[in-house]
From Swiss-Prot:
The lineage of its organism: Bacteria, Pseudomonadati, Pseudomonadota, Gammaproteobacteria, Pasteurellales. Its EC number is 1.17.7.3. It comes from Haemophilus ducreyi (strain 35000HP / ATCC 700724). [4Fe-4S] cluster binds at residues 270, 273, 305, 312. Its cofactor is [4Fe-4S] cluster. GO terms for biological process: isopentenyl diphosphate biosynthetic process, methylerythritol 4-phosphate pathway; terpenoid biosynthetic process. GO terms for molecular function: 4 iron, 4 sulfur cluster binding; 4-hydroxy-3-methylbut-2-en-1-yl diphosphate synthase activity (ferredoxin); 4-hydroxy-3-methylbut-2-enyl-diphosphate synthase activity (flavodoxin); iron ion binding. Belongs to the IspG family. SUPFAM superfamilies: Dihydropteroate synthetase-like (SSF51717), Nitrite and sulphite reductase 4Fe-4S domain-like (SSF56014). Transmembrane segments: none annotated. This is 4-hydroxy-3-methylbut-2-en-1-yl diphosphate synthase (flavodoxin).
């Protein structure tokens, strides 16, 4: 029930990655990357489809060899989500996947080669209307920038990015987005702030090599959260040493927490204490799993006692306040006469949530007639 926060987005040009708009007034897109071997076509397709199911807007696929490029051709034909080909070292791979319908090319300025090779990629992208992502990474800066700055700095990352933006400008190519990633939160944040002031193109956010699921989620939430709250960012990826599906879930959770883009159930739940009259932790865990299929934005509060329960329920679409044996139930902020049997709480609340979703879908369908 809480409204989206009117964060003033940085103004940028709009490009399209496949059918997904990026930049301008488009919603911030959530991206992930496969971690299968691309030549394992069956496994890669299965992972991409799993990412589609949890809402990934764009999926990046590493294409390190020509064999992987041939596999990419097959993969592209069997999935619906736009695919970005991640290209390093060999520019000819970019030319090959362009023939196979890639939706975006990601190149790394630090290792893709000289200007002539970049021009070959740009000319191909122009001919086929394929956008490019310039992906600068603190771990792979050009040698001369490493020598100039001594270590990765915001200025070094910015200089690397602008060096290649200038090349694309000279080639009269403006269908690109830029990232300046680092594993250090402060380095990444300051680099992105500088970049946001320097270019008008869309910006892809990420804290690279952030770590495992727990630490990486925290790093990403802090770094991306800071930037998003300042209006910076048009696409994002949460980089985790974990299942890529988790990257998408955390990405949407970050956007949801900032009330920038809502998708699915937003559970508001207390951390529990000795006052709780219901098993909040078990209830939330069960409902998160059961309701993963729901895409409709909805706030659901599950509070273990009457201290904060009623207040949270007042600003929720559905709310439960724990009480002895039978718990209070709120709908659209209004206390209902109906109460929930604590022993059947999970089933009863799931049914109410699904009924609320169906009601919303029906109302939207009527309005569209």
């Amino acid at each position: 029930m809480l409204k989206e926060v009117p964060i003033k987005r940085r103004q940028s040009t709009k490009i399209y990655v496949g059918n997904v708009p990026v930049g301008g007034d488009a919603p911030i897109a959530v991206q992930s990357m496969t971690n299968t071997r691309t030549t394992d076509i069956e496994a890669t397709i299965a992972q991409i489809k799993a990412l589609e199911r949890v809402g990934a807007d764009i999926v990046r696929v590493s294409v390190p060899t020509m064999d992987a490029a041939e596999a990419f051709k097959v993969i592209k034909q069997q999935v619906n989500v736009p695919l970005v080909a991640d290209i390093h070292f060999d520019y000819r791979i970019a030319l090959k996947v362009a023939e196979y319908g890639v939706d975006c090319l990601r190149i790394n300025p630090g290792n893709i080669g000289n200007e002539e090779r970049i021009r070959a990629v740009v000319d191909c992208a122009k001919d086929k209307n394929i956008p490019i992502r310039i992906g600068v990474n603190a771990g792979s800066l050009e040698r001369d920038l490493q020598e100039k700055y001594g270590e990765p700095t915001p200025q070094a990352l910015l200089e690397s990015a602008l060096r290649h933006v200038e090349i694309l400008d000279r080639f009269n190519f403006d269908q690109f987005k830029v990232s300046v990633k680092a594993s250090d939160v402060f380095l990444a944040v300051e680099s992105y702030r500088l970049l946001a002031k320097a270019i008008k193109q869309p910006i892809h956010l990420g804290i690279t090599e952030a770590g495992g699921a727990r630490a990486g989620s925290v790093k990403s939430a802090i770094g991306l959260g800071l930037l998003l709250s300042e209006g910076i960012g048009d696409t994002l990826r949460v980089s985790l040493a974990a299942d890529p599906v988790d990257e998408v879930k955390v990405g949407f959770d970050i956007l949801k927490s900032l009330r920038i883009r809502s998708r699915g159930i937003n559970f508001v739940a207390c951390p529990t204490c000795s006052r709780q009259e219901i098993d909040v932790i078990a209830t939330v865990n069960a409902l998160e799993q059961r309701l993963e299929d729901i895409l409709t934005p909805m706030d659901v509060s599950i509070i273990g006692c009457v201290v904060n329960g009623p207040g949270e329920a007042l600003v929720s679409d559905l709310g439960v306040t724990g009480s002895n044996k039978m718990s209070g139930f709120y709908l659209d902020g209004v206390r209902q006469k109906e109460r929930f049997d604590n022993d059947k709480l999970i089933d009863q609340l799931e049914a109410k949530i699904r009924a609320k979703v169906a009601q919303q879908h029906h109302r939207i369908a009527i309005e569209q007639i």
